[in-house]
Amino acid sequence: MGENILKEIKKCSTNMVHVCYAIYDKTGSFSRIAAASLQSLYDNTDAWVTVHILHDNTLSEENKEKYIYQARMQGQNIVFYNMDELLPDVIAKIKASDNDRFSPAAMYRLLLMHVLPKNVKKIIYLDCDTIINLDIEKLYNEPVGENGVAAVAELEATFYHAVEKEICNNGTVKRENYFCSGILMFDTEKYNNYPDICLDGMEILKKHPEYDCPDQDILNYYFADKYYHLPVKYDTFVDALRLPEIKQDELQECIYHYAGNAMELTKSEDIYNQLFFNYYVKTPWFDGNVFLKAVSVAMKARHDADKVIMNIMKDRNIVFCGNKETDLQRLQASKINCNGAVFLNIYADKNTIIMEKCLDYFEQNKKDRPLLLVMSAYPLINQALAQKGYKEGTDYLDASTLLIHDGISGRDLLKMINL
């Protein structure tokens, strides 16, 4: 107890750090992912933190109570804002927009100025699928831009493996300035000058249906010119770090962003999965017995999925795509029967993907019914192919499901734990 008192005194001697998360939890399982992020935030700072949770009616009272318990155990503050109750008309319009790629919570960060207390002058926004492997006060002490915003450029966050964005292709935003909206810092007095950014931004999306990252494209439309470019350590994409040419052997002091379902908890050798799970087990959501049962269920699901994949591959012309220098070696070292398969090199160099090679191959070989097995940068290629109308599971698959037989989506596993 004495140690906890000393820790509390130390916290009270520092400035308050304000951090915000947005949660839409229709299934009841997403709260668990945010809990791991919060645990990493608490564990890695001695600062006094107030967490502001923007949520709606999908956040259950049980999960809210667990968040409160988690914060109190760390001597921190947590405040909840029910957006359905505070801004019912705006939230109704967001939920009626029928964008199934992103949850309504993605837009809640555009409404901060309407719900935060006036004494909050600066705030960090964090996506729920992040692990804070540094002291959050370091980010809080960074400057913001002339327009009151600080963020990491997407090209840097993805180590130059980002998918093209239409808002950049049409010249509205310079590609090198386009930033990620998953980790942001706002000077709230300046951000408050844009009270209608959410609804006005939704009108922009209506005029440009090709803009497929709603909140991110809106924020870039308004702020890409004069925001402060944060160092990449404040928004580092885990999927990019797993690429053979970028892979790091040790964890760094940074904020890891598990965007694109990058959590694969049953791949135990992966340092980023280990990092996430090390924090998750400390949360009030973790139950060891339930977890072990879920892993067993997950393994059976993986086995069943392999059978489905093999049926999809039957009587198809198989095309592996990836980096000739690294992925081809992985393929040759695997036990997969590659007889008759084509390998499509889609890398100009170790950091540059030529997405057009995938698209051109499909167009030129339609009659041969090709099945593309993507060996690296799958989230990026998946997004690009889906935008062109190709179907995951029919036209292309993630080859890692064949090369590694112990994987299952981390979010799927967490859903199983929630049963």
Give residue ranges: language-model regions.
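A glycosyltransferase accessory/donor-loop signature
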Residues: 1-26, 33, 37, 186-312
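Histidine-anchored nucleotide/phosphate-binding helix
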Residues: 31-45, 329-334
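Active-site-proximal specificity loops/subdomain of glycosyltransferases
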Residues: 71-114
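Short loop->beta transition adjacent to catalytic acidic/histidine clusters or analogous donor-positioning motifs
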Residues: 44-53, 78
